[in-house]
Amino acid sequence: MVPFVRMLALAAALLAAPALGFAADATTVSPKGQKLAQELDSMGVESKWIAGAHIDWETGLPDGRPERMPGRHTHCSAFVAAFAKKLGIYVLRPPEHGQVLLANAQNEWLAGDGAAAGWRPVASALEAQTLANSGVLVLASYHNHRDDKPGHIAIVRPAATTPEAIAAVGPMVIQAGSVNSASIPAKDGFAGHVHAWRDNEIDYYAHEIAGE
């Protein structure tokens, strides 16, 4: 989504969204946040959803089919969709949309139809980390300026940090990508997209986890 249109859509969604409850700050991880972190780590993202492999989107394991996409096709959006499904939460995924350019499509879906599925925009990186620390599922999403080029999406992982660190390098995320990581600052995780961190074009969306 182009930056100006993206800002208008986010502002409208923020005005319409009900408030999410969260802990006081981003410096501590609540018991619910600790549970969320354990569930994220159980996905084994650093050994699954590997770039360049043709995978089953839900398991992250190679499906035996040759990868025909040019370059090293990455699976950030498949990992996010798989984890959300594990929690019983819907985010745009196959078969409603194929894996190719899914991150861009998820960004558009979150800003539009995602509200009806329980997703709410988050105003800042600091709030995104705070929500994750309280046990809320939070996504960090970037739409490429070109519709025919991939965007990126990651999950904000619970982590004890500081407002100063978040301002400098962003919230901590877990992601599949060119390099998969269970814990990496958003600034580094989105480094392959020059506009994402530099131009403040990462969108954050939150969804309460049932039973939490």
What is each PLM-predicted segment?
Residues 89-92, 156-162, 207:
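Short regulatory "switch" loops immediately downstream of catalytic or recognition motifs
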Residues 1-9:
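Bacterial N-terminal signal peptides that target proteins for export
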Residues 24-103:
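N-terminal capping segments
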Residues 97-179:
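...with weaker cross-activation on analogous glycine-rich loops/strands in unrelated enzymes
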Residues 169-212:
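Low-complexity, Gly/Ser/Thr/Pro-rich intrinsically disordered linker/tail segments
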